[in-house]
Amino acid sequence: MKNIKLVIEYDGTNYSGWQRQYNAITIQQRLEEAIEKATGEFSPVIGSSRTDAGVHARGFVCNFFTASKIPTSNIKMVLNTLLPEDIAVLDSKEVDSSFHSRYFTTGKEYSYTIVTGDRPPVIGRQYVYYFRRKLDIEKIKNSCEYFIGTHDFSAFKKKGSTARSSIRTIKELTVLKEKNIIKFNIVGDGFLYNMVRIIIGTLLEVGLGRFSIEYVKYILESKDRAKAGKPVPAKGLCLEKVFY
C-alpha cells in the first residue's frame, strides 16, 4: 500500500468547499472520483484544510493510500486526464506511510485580493472582491501589527466553530496596493473557521475610518465576535501554500 501526496490547485467557484457532502459537489468528491476511476479502488483523500465554498487554492496538499500499480510518476498525468478543468494536480509523490496531510502541517499561507475603482471587473471577477469605496491603506498597514504573534482569536471566528482552542499564531500579515488592486497575504500556524475573512473585513473597517487602529487591539482582547467586522466574500480568498 502506497501513501501518495498530492499538491493541487482549484477554482472553488462552482464547489461547496473541500469536504465531501451528501447534497453538494465538492473538491474532495471530484478528486476521489478521479482516483477511483484511475485505480479501480475507492481511496478516501485526506485534505490539509477544509476550505469553504467559493474559496480557491494554488497549493492545497492532500494524500491517499492505494494498492494500485500505476507508477507514482504517472499519477499526476493520469488524474489530470480525469479531473474537471477547474481542478489540477501540480505534483504527486510517494511519502512515508505515517504522513498525514492535515496533522503534519506547521502552517498555511492565504492571500486575499480586492479590486477597487468605479466599476467591478469582468475578467477574473470570480477571484476578487470588488470594493467601490476608498480605503486608507496606511491605516490598514498600521493595524496589521496587532495581529502578529500568538493571540486568542475568538473575536475572529465564526459562531459555531468547533475548534478546541482559539489560540493561533500569525507570523506575517501584509497588504500591498498596486493601482486598483489590493492584496493581503497572511501566514500562520493555523486558522479558525472564517478567521482570515473576518480579519480582512475588520481591516476594511479601519480603512474606511469606522474602526480606529487602536480598536483592533481592543477587539482582540475582547474575544467578542460581535465587535469585529463582517467576513469578506469567499471568492477573493486563496490558499497559497501549506507548510510542513
Curated annotation (Swiss-Prot):
Coiled-coil annotated spans: none
Enzyme class: isomerase
Residues annotated as the enzyme's active site: D52 (nucleophile)
Chain residues that bind substrate: Y110
Enzyme Commission number: 5.4.99.12
One protein family per Pfam: PseudoU_synth_1
CDD domains: PseudoU_synth_EcTruA
Alphabetical UniProt keywords: Isomerase, tRNA processing
GO biological process, one term: tRNA pseudouridine synthesis
Source superkingdom: Bacteria
InterPro entries for this protein: PsdUridine_synth_cat_dom_sf, PsdUridine_synth_TruA, PsdUridine_synth_TruA_a/b_dom, PsdUridine_synth_TruA_C, TruA/RsuA/RluB/E/F_N
Reactions it catalyzes: uridine(38/39/40) in tRNA = pseudouridine(38/39/40) in tRNA
Disulfide bridges in this chain: none
Assembly with partners or alone: Homodimer.
HAMAP family membership: TruA
Function: Formation of pseudouridine at positions 38, 39 and 40 in the anticodon stem and loop of transfer RNAs.
Similarity section: Belongs to the tRNA pseudouridine synthase TruA family.
Name this protein carries in UniProt: tRNA pseudouridine synthase A
